């Protein structure tokens, strides 16, 4: 009996000991879990505090072009609930920047935009209408969707430029835009018309965000949209064969090259085109039409002053009536000097505009007289009974205004070419004449004259055979 009791008591004692051990283990496990949770929470808070401190230390980029990025809720949650992501913030950010995010480079230029030029030479047999000409001029605006759409007018080249600040933005996931400094397409008119379009525009846009870009929750807003070109300019330049011809065309051409949306009508007083002139125009790169318009024989034979350049200018007027719809025409002689700002001023006129011209007659200037903002007369060294005693370089006319007067042309009357042409634009009131160049208080064009040079003597081909002089001699213009 005692032995049985002893056994029974031993069994109960063993049970109690086992229960105490199990309870102790549960308490230790609970304390461990609490400790680990506490450490985890403290570690997370420390990581978050360090990350916020790191973000606050990063400087903001002071750029003219700001790419705004929005983070989705899933993107933010990944940082709140994953302490590992806090450690990988810098590395993942660098990786994403290389693959999916937008990298922006801003370049400021005083006069010309950053461009990539693609050259195309050819003839375009279509009419030139400014209303259908379009281009991609970079304008700092904000959009709401990561897409970009633009169209180019069919078979018409375009231009970009202007005196403004521009920014070049390279975006690997949204937009990649390249533009060129280009000109207008020209129209082949007849067998004697030669056309060369020197430059064209190229547009490449990635309009669909990548999959990884969408997964990360980024919403990048493009900052550039398309804008139309300014009204076109039609520059009519009469020329004739002489030793200074190529030099003067080169000087004028490189002036016009700084003007956007321009077509240069070069019209020679000859029966056929000159390959040297065509070569020079090709090299300059300004969009042009090269035509011929010989002076009528009855004026060539006269011993009096000849009406030079009249047939050329009238030929240019015929071209505009046939091909142009709007814009502004301007008679630019190849020996004059021009401030390019006058071209930007004249392109927005509605009818007729005038301004002073320097180096004219004994007065040194030919100009409208302005009093209290109104045209009250003309100042010129030779009035000669003219209603409009102005220089050829001192006025411009709207193409639309010209086409409303189909009989307007320049008379074959030496000294009265400008006056006769402006009279043919009647009805034209003085109040309708716009005053440019700071209301005629500034001089932006000059009637310069190149010194006449004697024709080059013939090359001794026997003495200089197989030398560079044989090639140079072909570039000399002899009457």
UniProtKB/Swiss-Prot annotation:
The cellular location(s) given in this protein's UniProt record come to:
Golgi apparatus membrane
- List GO molecular-function terms, semicolon-separated: asioloorosomucoid beta-1,3-glucuronosyltransferase activity; galactosyl beta-1,3 N-acetylgalactosamine beta-1,3-glucuronosyltransferase activity; galactosylgalactosylxylosylprotein 3-beta-glucuronosyltransferase activity; metal ion binding; N-acetyllactosamine beta-1,3-glucuronosyltransferase activity
Q: GO cellular-component terms in the record? A: Golgi apparatus; Golgi membrane
The UniProt record lists the keyword Hydrolase: no
**Which BP terms in the Gene Ontology apply to this protein?**
carbohydrate metabolic process; chondroitin sulfate proteoglycan biosynthetic process; core 1 O-glycan biosynthetic process; glycoprotein biosynthetic process; glycosphingolipid biosynthetic process; protein N-linked glycosylation; proteoglycan biosynthetic process
UniProt keyword ATP-binding present:
no
- Residues the record marks as active site: 418 (proton acceptor)
* TM stretches of this protein: 35-50
What domain of life?
Eukaryota
Question: Where does the record say carbohydrate is attached?
Answer: 90, 97-98, 271, 460
Region of interest: Disordered? 94-122
Lumenal face residues: 51-479
Q: Which residues lie on this side of the membrane: Cytoplasmic?
A: 1-34
Please tell me which top-level EC class this enzyme sits in: transferase
This enzyme catalyses: 3-O-(beta-D-galactosyl-(1->3)-beta-D-galactosyl-(1->4)-beta-D-xylosyl)-L-seryl-[protein] + UDP-alpha-D-glucuronate = 3-O-(beta-D-GlcA-(1->3)-beta-D-Gal-(1->3)-beta-D-Gal-(1->4)-beta-D-Xyl)-L-seryl-[protein] + UDP + H(+)
SUPFAM superfamilies tied to this protein: Nucleotide-diphospho-sugar transferases
The way it spans or sits in the membrane comes to: Single-pass type II membrane protein
**Protein purpose:** Involved in the biosynthesis of L2/HNK-1 carbohydrate epitope on both glycolipids and glycoproteins. Enzyme has a broad specificity.
Q: Which family does it belong to?
A: Belongs to the glycosyltransferase 43 family.
Protein's UniProt name: Galactosylgalactosylxylosylprotein 3-beta-glucuronosyltransferase P
Q: What lineage does the source organism belong to?
A: Eukaryota, Metazoa, Ecdysozoa, Arthropoda, Hexapoda
Q: Which gene encodes it?
A: GlcAT-P
């Amino acid at each position: 009996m005692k032995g049985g009791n002893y056994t029974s008591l031993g069994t109960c004692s063993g049970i109690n000991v086992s229960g105490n051990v199990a309870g102790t283990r549960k308490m230790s496990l609970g304390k461990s879990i609490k400790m680990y949770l506490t450490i985890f929470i403290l570690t997370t808070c420390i990581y978050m505090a360090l990350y916020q401190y790191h973000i606050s230390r990063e400087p903001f980029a002071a750029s003219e072009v700001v790419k705004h990025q929005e983070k989705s809720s899933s993107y933010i949650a990944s940082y709140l609930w994953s302490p590992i992501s806090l450690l990988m913030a810098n590395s993942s950010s660098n990786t994403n920047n290389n693959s999916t995010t937008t990298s922006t480079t801003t370049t400021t230029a005083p006069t010309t935009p950053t461009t990539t030029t693609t050259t195309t030479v050819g003839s375009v047999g279509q009419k030139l209408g400014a209303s259908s000409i379009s281009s991609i001029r970079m304008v700092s605006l904000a959009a709401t969707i990561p897409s970009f759409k633009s169209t180019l007018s069919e078979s018409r080249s375009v231009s970009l430029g202007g005196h403004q600040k521009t920014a070049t933005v390279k975006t690997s996931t949204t937009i990649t835009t390249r533009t060129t400094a280009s000109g207008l397409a020209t129209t082949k008119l007849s067998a004697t018309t030669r056309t060369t379009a020197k430059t064209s525009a190229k547009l490449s846009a990635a309009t669909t965000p990548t999959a990884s870009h969408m997964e990360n929750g980024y919403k990048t807003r493009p900052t550039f949209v398309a804008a139309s070109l300014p009204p076109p300019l039609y520059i009519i330049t009469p020329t004739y064969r002489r030793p200074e011809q190529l030099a003067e065309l080169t000087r004028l051409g490189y002036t016009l090259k700084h003007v956007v949306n321009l077509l240069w009508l070069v019209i020679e007083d000859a029966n056929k085109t000159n390959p040297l002139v065509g070569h020079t125009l090709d090299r300059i790169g300004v969009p042009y039409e090269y035509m011929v318009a010989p002076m009528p024989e009855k004026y060539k034979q006269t011993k009096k002053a000849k009406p030079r350049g009249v047939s050329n200018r009238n030929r240019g007027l015929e071209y505009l009536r046939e091909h142009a719809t709007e814009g502004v025409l301007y008679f630019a002689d190849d020996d004059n000097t021009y401030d390019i700002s006058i071209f930007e001023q004249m392109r927005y006129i509605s009818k007729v505009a005038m301004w002073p011209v320097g180096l004219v007659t004994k007065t040194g200037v030919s100009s409208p007289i302005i009093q209290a903002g109104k045209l009250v007369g003309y100042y010129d060294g030779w009035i000669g009974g003219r209603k409009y005693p102005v220089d050829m370089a001192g006025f411009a006319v709207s193409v639309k205004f010209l086409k409303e007067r189909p009989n307007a042309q320049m008379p074959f009357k030496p000294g009265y070419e400008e006056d006769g042409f402006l009279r043919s634009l009647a009805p034209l009131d003085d109040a309708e004449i716009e005053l440019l160049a700071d209301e005629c208080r500034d001089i932006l064009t000059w009637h310069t004259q190149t010194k006449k040079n004697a024709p080059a003597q013939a090359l001794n081909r026997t003495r200089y055979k197989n030398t560079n002089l044989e090639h140079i001699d072909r570039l000399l213009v002899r009457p």
